[in-house]
Amino acid sequence: MTKILLVEDDKSLREIYGVRLLAEGYDIVSAGDGEEALAMAIKERPRLILSDVMMPKISGFDMLDILRSTTETKDVKVIIMTALSSEDQRKRGE
């Protein structure tokens, strides 16, 4: 079963996304902010991280930079979700 780390500071959205992903057969672990997600990524070793951008403590973009520079997490696939639509924001997530 594929493990996904779901990172979303809005508890209601985190629950909605989690229920849907569980229904699709994924193993879900979740975090409410980027700081918690970094610890969970090392501990849980997910195959994919699905993350919001705008979060307290550490943004999704900053979390992505840290994940990419950390040996244990540099190869984990990350999908960033955001309502931001500027070209700069899109490039930041690449």
Specify the residue positions occupied by each region the protein language model found:
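The feature encodes the CheY-like receiver
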Residues: 14, 56, 65, 74, ...
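Active-site beta3 strand of CheY-like receiver
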Residues: 44-50
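Two-component/phosphorelay signaling modules centered on CheY-like receiver
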Residues: 11-29
